[in-house]
From Swiss-Prot:
PROSITE patterns registered for this protein in UniProt: WD_REPEATS_1, WD_REPEATS_2, WD_REPEATS_REGION
Gene3D superfamilies recorded: 1.20.1280.50, YVTN repeat-like/Quinoprotein amine dehydrogenase
CDD domains named in the record: F-box_FBXW10, WD40
InterPro entries reported for this sequence: F-box-like_dom_sf, G-protein_beta_WD-40_rep, SCF_subunit_WD-repeat, WD40/YVTN_repeat-like_dom_sf, WD40_repeat_CS, WD40_repeat_dom_sf, WD40_rpt
More info: FBXW10B gene is located centromeric to and partially within proximal CMT1A-REP element. CMT1A-REP is a complex binary repeat element flanking a 1.5-Mb DNA region duplicated in Charcot-Marie-Tooth disease type I (CMT1A) or deleted in Hereditary neuropathy (HNPP).
Tissue: Expressed in pancreas, heart and skeletal muscle.
Repeat positions for WD: 169-206, 451-490, 493-532, 534-569, 572-609, 611-652
Keywords tagged on the record: Repeat, WD repeat
Protein name in UniProt: F-box and WD repeat domain containing protein 10B
Length: 752
């Protein structure tokens, strides 16, 4: 068998000639005819243009009407999918481009006569034996460049699966059918016999890899020697297919053997068992489906095909334009003050769910479901088919009027953490050190708090009780005396970085990256209770009855302090929940997915009531007089109506768009912290009371900034603001005659 294989390998080169002859002398036997056809093909094939080469190659491949031959060439051309072959095919050969310009006139002359030669060879090839077809095709593929080989691989794959589907007339699953030629044959006319056997193992292609107990062509299959198996296939074909192939069919026309360009595109585009449904769908449906994917997955889809890449690019552009339009609409809504009375105040009845004894909500006896549009959805429709009761609450258009800004610090620090409790001091941390800033005098207090071995990640200032709490990367919480700066107590127990803290009376709650929420007694420093998540804690809040905590997974959990039990778990966010706020009736959660979600704190009611959309992640949130106040990573503070989700006001916290890390509300003032600055902003008259402008003694109150009140619509550069608009202030803030560059510091935001 090995000798037969070696002779077969050299069969195309058998010649009836002497060693010095360049042209065969005999054209009668099959070997000599094959040699002459190959010789004549070499004369013109490499000199014609690419289109003619492709038409001739595809015409030859279409005459391979044997499933066995198609599978053989498919195995040979598997290397065209390798990375080295793809790299070589994608390279630009400048020398070939220059050569094509020189040979263009010669190609025009060749094209007139070569088409007739191609038709003659195709007619001869169609009536040749399988042995001749196999060897001629092998030598023709040797003359092809990498791009033509890729076309050949795609065409053979398509033809193979088409022939396979035609043979499988019993509607068998083609993945469970194995094709092989029958070993019994007649001496005169051996024809291809095909049978199928069911397999339990899934195979991507028939005859790809047989199990160990099966034999192919009477010999054991060895996956380590694919080339020897291929030669064995050729030797078997020499024995089986020595006769002429009968391909004459009704309506057969030898003039149509040369394939046109449309057929080439259909065949060379590849074939798969699974259709590309995106390509067959209308464009608007394809884009609608791709729009559901996240950006990372959408980038991967662009590598599937050119059509998918075009669709993915259009979806990205649509999403970008949609986000820009939505952001502009929200900004215009927040900047449009007409119809929004900053002094508006009213008492309204708000629905809250009715609860039974076990804390579950009561449903109506005969529910009626109704589909509502986005504009029809509000707080009242959120309790659809739920029994509710009315609770009287007060609403006000807080922070919707004019405002002024006072910059307390203008240093860039992405690790800055601040806390403000409404007094005269603000606690500020930078790395491991903590200091206090007097917002009245706008100067630092000389007391410095040192002792943490790691950076400070959480602060809580209690100015009334004269102490400061700090949580650090060193896993400890420290209790500091404000006047002396001495650490009087250390809370130990966390096994991860302290990320958040909150205080209610003498109960401190802390969360860390150890996935634990701990409740402490501030007076004794003892840990009273521990609650657990499965992911690191990012935010926590406490009141007399409940503790609310959130984690990186996007879950919000409500715990009962006295009973030490989990009341409910709120899920709905697709990103980590970084901020929380709750009162007796409602709970707000802000996440990296750009949503603020409103929930009910009553009993075990777990449905989301409202969702407030932001262009980027939400870093802080609060609820005041039924107005949702949120800080976003795009550098803006937004005020939403809790009833219907409408944005009432958009405030630019800084001109550079730095993320707003946190804010603290006290009366009609907001302390804002972001990466580059933190400022004390005074909102003027949202509750109908104008701040006093009188200064007593040498200490000027913050309300003196009310004299820098702006009545312009929009934002004006500092150079266009009148210097006389700034009244004299003491306390080191501004001199009596403030220059223009000081105005820019005093009035960072100039909105209405």
């Amino acid at each position: 068998m090995e000798n037969l294989e070696s002779r077969l390998k050299n069969a195309p080169y058998f010649r009836c000639e002497k060693g010095t002859d360049s042209i065969p002398l005999c054209r009668k036997c099959e070997t000599r005819v094959l040699a002459w056809k190959i010789f004549s093909t070499k004369e013109w094939f490499c000199r014609i243009n690419d289109i003619s080469q492709r038409r001739f190659l595809v015409g030859i491949l279409k005459q391979l009407n044997s499933l066995y031959l198609l599978h053989y060439f498919q195995n040979i051309l598997q290397t065209t999918q390798g990375k080295d072959f793809i790299y070589n095919r994608s390279r630009i050969d400048l020398s070939k481009k220059e050569g094509k310009v020189v040979k263009s006139s010669l190609n025009q002359m060749l094209d007139k006569t070569v088409e007739q030669k191609m038709k003659e060879i195709l007619y001869w090839f169609a009536n040749s034996t399988q042995w001749t077809k196999a060897n001629y095709t092998l030598l023709l593929l040797q003359m092809c460049n990498p791009k033509l080989l890729l076309t050949a691989a795609n065409v053979i794959r398509v033809l193979f699966l088409r022939e396979e589907n035609n043979i499988s007339g019993l509607n068998q699953d083609i993945t469970d059918v194995c094709f092989s030629p029958e070993k019994d044959h007649s001496s005169k006319s051996a024809t291809s016999q095909v049978y199928w056997t069911a397999k339990t193992q899934h195979t991507s292609l028939p005859l790809s890899k047989a199990p160990e107990n099966e034999h192919f062509l009477g010999a054991a299959s060895n996956p380590e020697e694919p080339w020897r198996n291929s030669l064995r296939c050729i030797s078997e074909m020499n024995r089986l297919f020595s006769g002429k192939a009968d391909i004459t069919k009704p309506g057969y026309d030898p003039c149509n053997l040369l394939v046109d360009l449309d057929d080439i595109r259909d065949l060379s585009s590849g074939f798969s068992k699974y259709r590309d449904f995106i390509r067959y769908l209308p464009i608007h449906l394809s884009k609608y489906i791709l729009r559901m994917l996240d950006r990372h997955t959408l980038n991967k889809c662009a590598s599937v095909s050119q059509h998918w890449a075009a669709m993915a690019q259009q979806v990205k552009m649509d999403l970008s334009a949609h986000g820009f339009i939505q952001n502009q609409i929200t900004f215009l809504q927040g900047s449009y003050t007409r119809g929004i009375d900053p002094n508006y105040a009213n008492k309204v009845s708000i629905p809250v769910p009715k609860m039974v004894d076990d804390g579950k909500s009561m449903r109506v006896k005969h529910p009626k479901w109704k589909l509502r549009t986005k504009n029809e959805y509000n707080l009242w429709t959120a309790y659809q088919n739920e029994e509710t009761q009315q609770v009287l609450m007060e609403e006000r258009n807080v922070f919707c009027g004019t405002y002024n800004v006072r910059i307390l610090s203008d240093t860039w620090d992405q690790n800055r953490v601040i806390h403000y409790s409404g007094g005269d001091l603000i606690a500020v941390s930078s790395n491991r050190k903590i200091h206090l800033l007097d917002i009245i005098q706008v100067k630092a207090i000389p007391v410095e708090f040192r002792g943490h071995a790691g950076s400070v990640r959480a602060l809580f200032l209690c100015e009334e009780e004269n102490f400061l709490l700090s949580g650090s990367y060193d896993l400890s919480i420290r209790y500091w005396d404000l006047k002396s700066g001495v650490c009087t107590r250390i809370f130990g127990g966390h096994q991860g970085t302290i990320t958040c803290m909150d205080l209610c009376k003498n109960r401190l709650v802390s969360g860390g990256r150890d996935c634990q929420v701990k409740v402490w007694d501030v007076d004794t420093g003892k840990c009273l209770k521990t609650f657990r998540h499965k992911d690191p804690i990012l935010a926590t809040r406490i009141n007399d009855t409940y503790i609310v905590s959130s984690c990186e997974r996007g879950l919000v959990k409500v715990w009962h302090i006295a009973m030490a039990q989990l009341v409910k778990t709120l899920s709905g966010h697709e990103g980590a929940v970084k901020c929380l706020f709750f009162d007796q009736w409602h709970l707000l959660s802000g996440s990296t997915d750009g949503l603020v979600m409103a929930w009910s704190m009553v009993g075990k009611y777990e449905r989301c009531l409202m969702a407030f959309k932001h262009p980027k992640e939400v870093l802080d949130v609060s609820l005041l007089f039924l107005r949702v106040i949120s800080a976003c990573a795009d550098g803006k503070i937004r005020i939403y109506n809790f009833f219907n989700g409408n944005c009432m006001k958009v405030i630019k916290a800084n001109g550079r768009g730095d993320p707003v890390l946190s804010f603290f509300i006290q009366g009609n003032r907001i302390s804002v912290c972001h990466i580059s600055t933190f400022a004390k902003r005074i909102n003027v008259g949202w509750n109908g009371i104008e701040p006093s402008a009188t200064a007593q003694g040498g200490n000027a109150s913050l309300t003196e900034c009310a004299h820098v009140r702006l009545h312009i619509a929009g934002h004006l550069p500092a150079s266009r603001l009148p210097v006389a608009a700034v009244q004299p202030m003491t306390g080191g803030m501004a001199p009596t005659t403030a220059p223009t560059h000081v105005l820019a510091m005093l009035i960072l935001f100039s909105g209405v």
